[in-house]
């Protein structure tokens, strides 16, 4: 009996580690597939006209209505060499595919709060390296938009004051769980605020 218990513990550990590895590989595969879809979605304005004139951008903006779970664009973070797909929605299935766009928040040129969320152990695992002044870029079918990080903040996971859905000024907000190395459901949230520069 004494030999069976250690073997059972080792087997259970291997099963848990194997499942964790499978989930990580599965999520990375979904993210890569969604990035391909997002690249196609973000190319549409250039392919349609060969240029980025304001009339074409307005037409593309008017038809820009991503459905839940659909790739809507790309988030580029030059400092950490990241190119991440943006998916409409923040449910668990959506976040497995990439960075989730909070459904009730806005998109660029809508003069409101743009909220993007991602997992700290997948798409946003290196966001802790970002600093004030670093750039974030959104590539959508109707244009490219650059934001500069103006501040970061750590809040309690139950703090609902971050997502205000204000409609007074355009701001980009990235949210992820914190601490980054925490195992399990993290008690805090890491928030990055960006202001539009182009």
Curated annotation (Swiss-Prot):
Q: Which UniProt keywords apply?
A: Cell membrane, Hydrolase, Membrane, Protease, Thiol protease, Transmembrane, Transmembrane helix
Cell location: Cell membrane
Lineage: superkingdom: Bacteria
Q: List the disulfide bonds.
A: none
Q: Where is the composition biased (Polar residues)?
A: 48-57
| Enzyme superclass (EC) | hydrolase
Q: Site Transition state stabilizer: which residues?
A: 189
Q: Give the induction text.
A: Preferentially expressed in the late stationary phase.
What GO molecular function annotation could you give as one example from this UniProt entry?
Answer: cysteine-type peptidase activity
Q: Where is the composition biased (Basic and acidic residues)?
A: 36-46
What GO cellular component term, any one, is given? plasma membrane
**Gene disruption phenotype:** Mutant releases elevated levels of the sortase substrate YfkN into the culture medium upon phosphate starvation. Inactivation of the gene abolishes the cell wall anchoring of a fusion protein composed of a beta-lactamase reporter and the C-terminal region of the sortase substrate YhcR.
Regions crossing the membrane: 7-25
**Keyword check for Lipoprotein:** no
Membrane protein topology class: Single-pass type II membrane protein
Question: Any idea what job this protein has?
Answer: Transpeptidase that anchors surface proteins to the cell wall. Recognizes and modifies its substrate by proteolytic cleavage of a C-terminal sorting signal. Following cleavage, a covalent intermediate is formed via a thioester bond between the sortase and its substrate, which is then transferred and covalently attached to the cell wall. This sortase recognizes a Leu-Pro-Asp-Thr-Ser/Ala (LPDTS/A) motif. It has two substrates, YhcR and YfkN.
Q: Which family does it belong to?
A: Belongs to the bacterial sortase family. Class D subfamily.
Protein name as it appears in the record: Sortase D
């Amino acid at each position: 009996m004494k030999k069976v218990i250690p073997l059972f513990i080792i087997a259970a550990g291997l099963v848990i580690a194997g499942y964790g590895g499978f989930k990580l590989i599965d999520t990375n595969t979904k993210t890569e597939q969604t990035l391909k879809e997002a690249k196609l979605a973000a190319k549409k304005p250039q392919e349609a006209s060969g240029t980025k004139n304001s009339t074409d951008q307005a037409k593309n903006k008017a038809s820009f209505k991503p459905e839940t779970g659909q790739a809507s664009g790309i988030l580029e973070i030059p400092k950490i060499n990241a190119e991440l797909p943006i998916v409409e929605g923040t449910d668990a299935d959506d976040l497995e595919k990439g960075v989730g766009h909070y459904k009730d928040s806005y998109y660029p040129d809508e003069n409101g709060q743009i909220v993007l969320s991602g997992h700290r152990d997948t798409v946003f695992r290196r966001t802790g390296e970002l600093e004030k002044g670093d750039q974030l870029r959104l590539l959508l079918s109707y244009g490219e938009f650059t934001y500069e990080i103006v501040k970061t903040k750590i809040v309690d996971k139950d703090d609902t004051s971050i997502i205000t859905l204000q409609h007074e000024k355009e701001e980009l907000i990235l949210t992820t769980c914190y601490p980054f190395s925490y195992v399990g459901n993290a008690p805090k949230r890491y928030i990055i605020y960006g202001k539009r520069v182009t």
